[in-house]
């Protein structure tokens, strides 16, 4: 089974992924969605004895906390990077710029 805990700023995306998994035929309970802030929802997952591996994308500071708390669990991390952003030829450039700035700086880590 897998547990998905996405950013608290994107709860609808996480919920939709869960719905799509069910629609694709993945049995209930195989993909589990958890909503909440990192300290409240993420830390208990990192510490839980039944969690064998952790994949995390976010800030270096949070990654360091996960490494300290994870013990001997396997982990994969993408830390401190910037989000890729595709702007198509027919895009409204003012809206695209606003969206890029929002996504880069509003969901850091």
Give short role names for the model-derived ranges.
Residues 58:
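Residues that line or immediately flank small-molecule/substrate-binding pockets and catalytic motifs
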Residues 1-29:
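Conserved small-residue-rich beta-alpha loop and adjacent elements
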Residues 14-17, 45, 66:
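Hydrophobic packing residues within well-ordered alpha-helices of enzyme cores
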Residues 5-7, 35, 88-89:
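Short beta->alpha connector loops at strand-helix junctions that form conserved
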Residues 47-48, 53, 61-109:
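ALDH superfamily catalytic-core signature
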Residues 32-55:
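A structured beta-alpha segment of the ubiquitous adenosine-cofactor-binding alpha/beta core
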Residues 9-12, 39-40, 61-62:
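Short alpha-helical
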């Amino acid at each position: 089974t897998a547990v998905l805990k996405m950013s608290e700023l994107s709860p609808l995306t996480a919920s939709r992924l869960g719905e799509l998994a069910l629609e694709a035929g993945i049995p209930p309970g195989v993909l589990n969605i958890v909503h909440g802030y990192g300290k409240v929802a993420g830390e208990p997952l990192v510490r839980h004895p039944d969690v064998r591996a952790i994949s995390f994308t976010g800030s270096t500071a949070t990654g360091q906390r996960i490494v300290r708390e994870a013990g001997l669990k396997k982990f994969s991390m993408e830390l401190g990077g910037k989000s890729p952003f595709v702007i198509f030829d027919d895009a409204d450039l003012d809206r695209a710029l606003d969206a890029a700035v929002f996504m880069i700086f509003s969901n850091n880590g």
